[in-house]
Swiss-Prot record:
Its EC number is 3.6.1.27. It is found in: Cell inner membrane. Pfam families: BacA (PF02673). It catalyses: di-trans,octa-cis-undecaprenyl diphosphate + H2O = di-trans,octa-cis-undecaprenyl phosphate + phosphate + H(+). It comes from Escherichia coli O1:K1 / APEC. Keywords: Antibiotic resistance, Cell inner membrane, Cell membrane, Cell shape, Cell wall biogenesis/degradation, Hydrolase, Membrane, Peptidoglycan synthesis, Transmembrane, Transmembrane helix. This is Undecaprenyl-diphosphatase. Disulfide bonds: none annotated. Bacitracin is thought to be involved in the inhibition of peptidoglycan synthesis by sequestering undecaprenyl diphosphate, thereby reducing the pool of lipid carrier available. Belongs to the UppP family. It is a multi-pass membrane protein.
Amino acid sequence: MSDMHSLLIAAILGVVEGLTEFLPVSSTGHMIIVGHLLGFEGDTAKTFEVVIQLGSILAVVVMFWRRLFGLIGIHFGRPLQHEGESKGRLTLIHILLGMIPAVVLGLLFHDTIKSLFNPINVMYALVVGGLLLIAAECLKPKEPRAPGLDDMTYRQAFMIGCFQCLALWPGFSRSGATISGGMLMGVSRYAASEFSFLLAVPMMMGATALDLYKSWGFLTTGDIPMFAVGFITAFVVALIAIKTFLQLIKRISFIPFAIYRFIVAAAVYVVFF
């Protein structure tokens, strides 16, 4: 593979990662399809995907840096409030409660989960995740019990964490699982999305660090330019995607995302079967 060709592939996959990582559409499903079409598969490809996820994580840190510092007791200016008056304040305990279920299951069944990374499982996960998004829109309370991020209870945070376990199924979408769970628990669409992004930072950093440790042997110095392009592209595109997504969900429901998931599932079937 020539240098220019590999850099082009890195840029394309960086765009795909940045666009889909935090949308409820499954970045895994998209990366599998695009990687297959580009002929970029195997151990190096898997390591590359792990590295560029760090770019997406960095985008969340940049977007929510004030809120993240606030979780550890460092505040800049007035406390942040979004989408409704605050009755309390989101704390690090909320994040920890949202992490525990998936962390426990992820550590216990890490190898089993990795064995599920194949097109057929991803295809089914895309469909089931789409159905969950539709269920969340149809069954959510008419008036959210937690209109703002700071209105969330510990119970809601923990239940969102339980829904996050669904994302251990490759192709399900971590953001889709957590946002749907939040809405079903009475958290507003916007606040559930914000919490999903905040929860992504420790969850994805932990999972990425573990995957990177296990994949370290596949890295070579020759891969650095390609990985750097993918990382930077994913970071920039994820920044734009997050900003756009948070504005978009104020105006539309998640039904279009569910329909899109069904289309991607059909694409997986066409490409691989």
